[in-house]
From Swiss-Prot:
Keywords: ATP-binding, Cytoplasm, Nucleotide-binding, Protein transport, Translocase, Transport
Protein EC: 7.4.2.8
Expression triggers: Induced by phosphate limitation.
InterPro entries (UniProt xref): AAA+_ATPase, GSPE_N1E, P-loop_NTPase, T2SS/T4SS_dom, T2SS_E_N_sf, T2SS_GspE
Domain of life, per lineage: Bacteria
Positions contributing to ATP binding: G246, P247, T248, G249, S250, G251, K252, T253
Function as written in the Swiss-Prot or TrEMBL entry: ATPase component of the type II secretion system required for the energy-dependent secretion of extracellular factors from the periplasm. Acts as a molecular motor to provide the energy that is required for the export of proteins. The Hxc system is involved in the secretion of low-molecular-weight alkaline phosphatase L-AP (LapA). Is probably also involved in the secretion of the phosphate-binding protein PstS.
Pfam families recorded: GSPE_N1E, T2SSE
Catalysed transformations (reactions): ATP + H2O + cellular proteinSide 1 = ADP + phosphate + cellular proteinSide 2
Subcellular location: Cytoplasm
SMART domains: AAA
Disruption phenotype: Mutant cannot secrete the low-molecular-weight alkaline phosphatase LapA. Deletion mutant shows decreased ability to express outer surface PstS, but not intracellular PstS.
Name of protein: Type II secretion system protein HxcR
Length: 469
């Protein structure tokens, strides 16, 4: 935290950092002399330190990203709501810390977004009830309460968010979807906004997409060597289908992005069809579906097949038409990467057959299926060892949850010649699973044993995320 307003500190290239023995004034070669004199006169810093200009940017972002405590803003906002300020126009992309607007509702929303980014929340829920509202963050896959504003503040919060997302603030009877692009402490954040009417007002969910998070590599996703090496071999095949399966929020898209980043976009024509485009991938053409204008997955896929693609990524195979186009594309010399909603890897074959894809086509086109879940990591500050394992406790570092961060557990179903023969014959799912196990496939629960042994998570956490697997 600093004692100087962020906009002034950024413009004048000065950071006043409190310390045990007095404040330190950090400056760069671009800091004007009059600004140094003014800070010295007003705050009497104990010392002066010069840093590189780019280093000062990093220090500014770090210091001021901790000033947006949502709970600290709620009290002031509840007592002074200025609805007229909600209609103020805002720039298309802005850094929240640059905002000098004093309207309490705007300050509160800025604080909520800043704190969510700092806590690495994936979603913000704003839920209305009879006497109050509740704001919750989803962190590491679990929801937790953040603040509970009075009910009188709810409509103002929703209206401001709808303005930021360019939604119709007068329409309160129908669901609406929008998008906000902004920066928080220098980090580009894309926010998908969804509103739905309820009996006590509009409910809002904001999905936060940190664009820098899309630069992950497969090696950082927690895959065992016995999964990473064969998966790397699958995605380097010239044609065929590789699927990633799991429930919503299990990291499927992140895995596909990491796989695409592993491939050479300079020598291959890589195109994606997504709903929505979550992260920008350099060197890759990304297409977003739009149901309002009938730009469906199937329509987009037919179009990109005329774009001379080498590799195609499909955000999700949702229907027979999309599945058939994906299969035909793989049979005509294209590598297709896609996601599918199934509980485990083997059931992906059953799901596609149930959709209406012929087994002989799947046998000819499929290369493999990766199923995955995300498990919470134990907080290293407070975990305790007992009975040969580890237990979550809770401390300030992990917001009393006992967990901090997540990692993946996986099972990789490689379609070898024997399994290909079984698929062609239309054999039962259990026969495919037995053949895969005989070939060395490990289940997600078995994969999770290594994280339990290393003290990274607990047996309860592995069982929680694999109940349906």
């Amino acid at each position: 935290m600093s004692l100087l307003p962020y906009a002034w500190a950024k413009a004048q290239r000065a950071l006043l950092r409190p310390g045990e023995h007095g404040a330190t004034l950090l400056v760069s070669p671009r800091t004007p002399g009059w600004a140094i004199s003014e800070v010295r006169q007003r705050h009497a810093p104990a010392s002066l330190e010069s840093v590189r200009d780019d280093e000062l940017d990093t220090l500014l972002a770090s210091a001021y990203s901790d000033t947006g405590s949502a709970a600290a803003v709620v009290g002031a906002a509840e007592s002074e709501v200025d609805l007229d300020r909600l209609m103020d126009d805002i720039p298309e992309v802005t850094d929240l810390l640059d905002t000098q607007d004093g309207a309490p509702v705007i300050r509160m929303i800025n604080a909520l977004l800043t704190q969510a980014a700092r806590d690495e929340a994936s979603d913000i829920h704003i839920e209305p009830f009879e006497t109050h509202s509740v704001v919750r963050y989803r962190v590491d896959g679990a929801l937790r309460d953040v603040v509970a504003p009075r009910k009188a503040l709810h409509a103002a919060l929703v209206s401001r968010i709808k303005i930021m997302a360019q939604l119709d603030i007068a329409e309160k009877r129908l669901p609406q979807d929008g998008r906000i692009a902004l920066r928080v402490a220098g980090r580009p954040i894309d926010i998908r906004v969804s509103t739905v009417p309820t009996g006590h007002g509009e409910r809002v969910v904001m999905r936060l997409l940190d664009k820098q998070a899309g630069r992950l590599r497969l090696e950082t996703l927690g895959m065992a060597p016995g999964v990473l090496a064969p998966l790397d071999n699958l995605i380097r095949q010239p044609h065929g289908i590789v699927l990633v399966t799991g429930p919503t929020g299990s990291g499927k898209t992140t895995t596909l992005y990491a796989a695409l980043a592993r491939l050479d976009a300079s020598t291959s024509n890589i195109l994606t069809v997504e709903d929505p485009v979550e992260y920008d991938l350099p060197g890759i053409s990304q297409i977003q579906v739009n149901a309002r204008i009938d730009m469906t997955f199937a329509v987009a896929l037919r179009a990109i097949l005329r774009q001379d693609p080498d590799i195609i990524m499909i955000g999700e195979i949702r229907d027979l038409e999309t599945a058939q186009i994906a299969v035909q594309a793989s049979l005509t010399g294209h590598l297709v990467l896609a996601t599918l909603h199934t509980n485990d890897a083997v059931s992906a074959v059953t799901r596609l057959v149930d959709m209406g894809v012929e087994p002989f086509l799947l046998a000819s086109s499929m290369l493999g299926v990766l199923a995955q879940r995300l498990v919470r990591r134990l907080c290293t500050h407070c975990r305790v060892e007992e009975d040969g394992g580890w237990r979550a406790v809770g401390c300030p570092a992990c917001n009393q949850t006992g967990y901090s961060g997540r990692t993946g557990i996986h099972e990789l179903f490689v379609i070898d010649d024997e399994i290909r023969r079984l698929v062609h014959q239309g054999r039962a799912e259990q026969d495919l699973r037995e053949a895969a196990r005989a070939a060395g496939m490990r289940s997600m629960r078995e994969d999770g044993e290594r994280w339990i042994a290393s003290g990274s998570t607990t047996l309860e956490e592995i069982l929680r995320v694999t109940r349906d697997a």
